[in-house]
């Protein structure tokens, strides 16, 4: 058994020089407003960073094990859960909802989900577990799919909703196809909840989370995203600014904290599908489906951005599907917990990186492509073996098919010299094995939720 507390996080004890993000990030004019947002975001990054990340990964595996033990557990302590999922047969007592993963099982069995939408905010696991989005605000109903005014957006449009300076839980009156004229700049404390409708963000620009905190993006399609030309764009209720050309990412997370992306279907973006850079941390990406793309996820933008040592991201219960090539994810610095995902397609590699990131791969299924040179799951980029051999890239209970293999490095059980509140080994919870991934990810992507029926 790999013990996360033992190898992960030697860099935690090291001194960390914090570098304020220097990239302008498509902000043509860095005025007082953006300077203050950047300062606030840096503070949020430092406060959101968990110095004991092994506790977070163990917490995730605890709940994953609990969800799989469908016969029920009376005493939900760590000691009692040590044997959860270790060879026990599960009993289907409640129909298909007994087989859901730990996040979905929290809310999907409720046929009145539409009357209690905010229950969703209680269900996130992983590094983004403190994300609540717009839970503390009112419901905002998007009634108009247009995006015609970038400075004074029409009430009822999604651009009007996401730029309000207060928490909002944003839902949709009906199914919509939304073509964004320019990047959609989202403010703090927002939930975009597409349940009950088919919501497509397509044919235009993507979503931008820049120097913000506490955002949930749930149950929408994002496809065929293009670069935006820039110009004057509203970025909060009281401010607009001049933007340069946007990258064409589906979701661009820049200096943002406490972000949860769940049940999103993504296809064919001009640049990355999801980029998390420049001090972004406390993020969970779950239950999503990705197809038809080259560079899927980039975590850490450049070799100079040492602020990304604070990056902590959970990637869980996702399906990496047809016609994907690479970066699922590609990581610089930081730590990524890749757990219970289904990797059915890649052309070059699945998980890669440089600049000494920590990558914990647990209970994933990797099905290698027929290309002999591409069967290795991992790729250390632009780094010689003598350097990367000490990086902590670990695989536990992964399931490898068609010749797939994961090249590990680092010391799996080398305890940090000064661990802070480590989980005792006898209480550590094992991840669910990769052999169960097909079941755990069977509903990845958007859901066809209907009011009055279990989702």
Curated annotation (Swiss-Prot):
Binds 1 Ca(2+) ion. Required for its activity. The active site is at residue 327. The keyword rRNA-binding does not apply. The keyword Coiled coil does not apply. One of its GO terms (biological process) is pectin catabolic process. Ca(2+) binds at residues 247, 271, 275. Pathway: Glycan metabolism; pectin degradation; 2-dehydro-3-deoxy-D-gluconate from pectin: step 2/5. Its cofactor is Ca(2+). It is an enzyme of class 4 (lyase). One of its GO terms (molecular function) is pectate lyase activity. Keywords: Calcium, Glycoprotein, Lyase, Metal-binding, Signal. This is Probable pectate lyase 6. It catalyses: Eliminative cleavage of (1->4)-alpha-D-galacturonan to give oligosaccharides with 4-deoxy-alpha-D-galact-4-enuronosyl groups at their non-reducing ends. It comes from the Eukaryota. It comes from Arabidopsis thaliana (Mouse-ear cress). SUPFAM superfamilies: Pectin lyase-like. Glycans are attached at residues 55, 75. Belongs to the polysaccharide lyase 1 family. Its EC number is 4.2.2.2. Residues 1-25 form the signal peptide.
């Amino acid at each position: 058994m790999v013990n996360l507390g033992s190898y992960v996080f030697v860099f935690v004890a090291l001194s960390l020089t914090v570098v304020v993000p220097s990239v302008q990030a498509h902000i043509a004019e860095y005025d007082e407003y953006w300077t203050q947002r950047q300062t606030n975001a840096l503070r949020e990054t430092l406060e959101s960073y968990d110095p004991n990340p092994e506790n977070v990964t163990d917490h995730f595996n605890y709940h994953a094990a609990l969800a799989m033990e469908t016969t029920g557990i009376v005493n939900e302590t760590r000691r009692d859960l040590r044997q959860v999922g270790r060879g026990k047969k599960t009993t289907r007592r409640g129909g298909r909802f007994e087989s859901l993963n730990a996040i979905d099982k929290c809310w999907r069995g409720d046929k009145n989900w539409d009357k209690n939408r905010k229950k969703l905010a209680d269900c996130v696991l992983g590094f983004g577990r403190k994300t609540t989005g717009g839970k503390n605000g009112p419901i905002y109903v998007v009634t108009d799919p247009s995006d015609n005014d970038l400075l004074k957006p029409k009430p009822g449009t999604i651009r009007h909703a996401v730029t309000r300076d207060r928490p909002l839980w944003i839902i949709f009156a009906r199914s919509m196809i939304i073509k964004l004229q320019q990047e959609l700049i989202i403010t703090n404390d927002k939930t975009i909840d597409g349940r009950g409708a088919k919501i497509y963000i397509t044919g235009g620009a993507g979503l931008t989370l820049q120097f913000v905190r506490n955002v949930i993006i749930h149950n929408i399609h994002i496809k065929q995203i293009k670069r935006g030309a820039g110009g004057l764009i509203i970025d909060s209720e009281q401010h607009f600014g001049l933007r340069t050309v946007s990258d064409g990412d589906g979701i661009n997370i820049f200096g943002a904290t406490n972000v949860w992306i769940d049940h999103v279907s993504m296809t064919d973006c001009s640049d990355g599908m999801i980029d998390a850079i420049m001090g972004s941390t406390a993020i969970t990406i779950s239950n999503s489906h990705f197809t038809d793309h080259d560079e899927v996820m980039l975590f850490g933008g450049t070799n100079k951005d040492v602020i990304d040592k604070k990056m902590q991201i959970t990637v869980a219960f996702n399906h990496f599907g047809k016609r994907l090539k690479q970066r699922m994810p590609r990581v610089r610095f930081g730590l990524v917990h890749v757990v219970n995902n289904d990797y059915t397609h890649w052309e070059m590699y699945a998980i890669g990186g440089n600049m000494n990131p920590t990558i914990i791969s647990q209970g994933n299924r990797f099905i290698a492509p027929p290309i002999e040179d591409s069967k290795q799951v991992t790729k250390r980029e632009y780094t010689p073996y003598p350097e990367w051999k000490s990086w902590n890239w670990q695989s536990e209970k992964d399931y490898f098919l068609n010749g797939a293999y994961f090249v590990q490095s680092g010391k799996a059980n080398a305890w940090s010299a000064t661990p802070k509140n480590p989980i005792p080994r006898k209480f550590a919870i094992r991840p669910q094995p990769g052999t169960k991934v097909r079941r755990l990810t069977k509903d990845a992507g958007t859901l066809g939720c209907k009011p009055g029926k279990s989702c």
